[in-house]
Amino acid sequence: MNYTDINAKTVDSWVQNGWKWGRPISHETFEKAKNGEWGVYLTPTKIVPHEWFGEMRGKKILGLASGGGQQIPVFTALGADCTVLDYSTEQLKREEEVGKREGYTPKCVRADMTKPLPFADESFDLIFNPVSNCYIEELEPVWRECARVLKPGGVLL
């Protein structure tokens, strides 16, 4: 078993045991986001400034290692076209739970971000990658793939 498989199983276990980053947003939080009241975390301590995102409606967003039902549902509520890629089955289940509750079908992809991403070149306007790169051995291939799937002028957070 390679280290990314071990990581996925570990994260699955954390989520099953109530891990903070595996608890999906509430219906109330989703509704507030639809009305423009929202905040998401990229790191554990500070909400990302809205200015970093620009207009969200219609923006194609990849949540890279961003399962858990926290950020991607907020972006969806704001009108973005979102895809979430995560290696944790439990994190993707949380995305699906929020989608079912809120009446949309999330685009969930179970994949390893250390491998070539299963998307065409220039597919996304923005990639949102909350704390996850500390769990992998080599960053350069991940950043190279992000550059490939970002549209010209796209943003990686």
Please report, for each region that a protein language model flagged, where it lies by residue.
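Residues that mark the start of a beta-strand
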Residues: K60-L62, S123, K151
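Class I SAM-dependent methyltransferase SAM/SAH-binding core
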Residues: K59-P116
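N-terminal, positively charged/glycine-rich alpha-helical extensions of SAM-dependent methyltransferases
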Residues: M1-E31
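A short SAM/SAH-binding and catalytic strip from SAM-dependent methyltransferases
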Residues: D125-E140
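A short acidic, Gly/Pro-enriched loop at the edge of an enzyme's catalytic core
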Residues: T114-I127
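Conserved alpha-helix/loop element of class I SAM-dependent methyltransferases that forms part
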Residues: P24-K59
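A short glycine-rich, Lys/Arg-flanked "PGG" loop and its adjoining helix->strand segment in the class I
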Residues: E140-V155
